[in-house]
A protein has these predicted regions:
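N-terminal secretory signal peptides and thylakoid transit peptides that target proteins
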Residues: 1-16
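C-terminal segment of N-terminal export signals and the immediately downstream linker at the start
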Residues: 20-52
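Iron-sulfur cluster-binding cysteine motifs and their immediate structural context
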Residues: 23-29, 51-73, 97-124, 130-147, ...
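Short, solvent-exposed loop/turn segments at the edges of secondary structure
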Residues: 34, 87, 145-150
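Short amphipathic alpha-helical segments
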Residues: 35-39, 88, 116
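Mid-chain, structured segments of secreted extracytoplasmic proteins
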Residues: 70-99
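Cys/His-clustered metal-coordination modules, chiefly Zn-binding fingers
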Residues: 153
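Extracellular glycan-interaction patches encoded by glycine-rich segments
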Residues: 157-163
């Protein structure tokens, strides 16, 4: 394939414009007091063992029947005997503009200014479930013991506070 000088310069111009715009979006997203936590789940390495779910449950004292994160198995891919599955992590995405924070009538759902983590203050939560209805990822739940909203908080009150990584990592 040969490119004319005009096609090349047009392509470079488009690339520069797109790169500049993408950089501004990333910079805006990452600028919460200089810190922004994020979770990357490498689906190519996940075998679906759910050890991450068990570790989360143990460290954060989440009872059986509910979970702060879920590993979802895909439909089978391929034909027997060469069937493969893919595994996906489903947990809080800590949205930039979190609908759960916007709808909370008591301010229990909030974004931590120091880390950017969207969290729930159980002392303020009245269990109205507005945040559960507003969550586009359907990852919040009512904790069966405390009767308050709960979700992934990157182990903010447990492992992160002790200088460790989240339990699921």
């Amino acid at each position: 394939m040969t490119w004319s000088r005009r096609q090349f310069l047009t392509g470079v111009g488009v690339l520069a414009a797109v790169s500049g715009t993408a950089g501004r979006v990333v910079a805006k997203t990452l600028n919460i007091n200089g810190v922004r936590y994020g979770m990357v789940h490498d689906e190519s390495l996940c075998i679906g063992c759910t050890a991450c779910m068990d570790a989360c449950r143990e460290v954060n004292k989440v009872p059986e029947g509910v979970s702060r994160l879920t590993i979802i198995r895909s439909e089978p891919q391929g034909e027997f005997p060469d069937v493969k599955y893919r595994f996906f992590r489903k947990s809080c995405q800590h949205c930039d503009h979190a609908p759960c924070v916007d709808v909370c009538p008591t301010g229990a759902s909030f974004r931590d200014a120091a880390s950017g983590i969207v969290d729930v203050n159980p002392d303020l939560c009245v269990g109205c479930q507005y945040c559960i209805a507003a969550c586009p990822y359907r990852v919040r739940f009512i904790h069966p013991v405390t009767k308050t909203a709960d979700k992934c908080d990157f182990c903010r009150k447990t492992n992160l506070q002790a200088g460790k990584l989240p339990a699921c990592v």
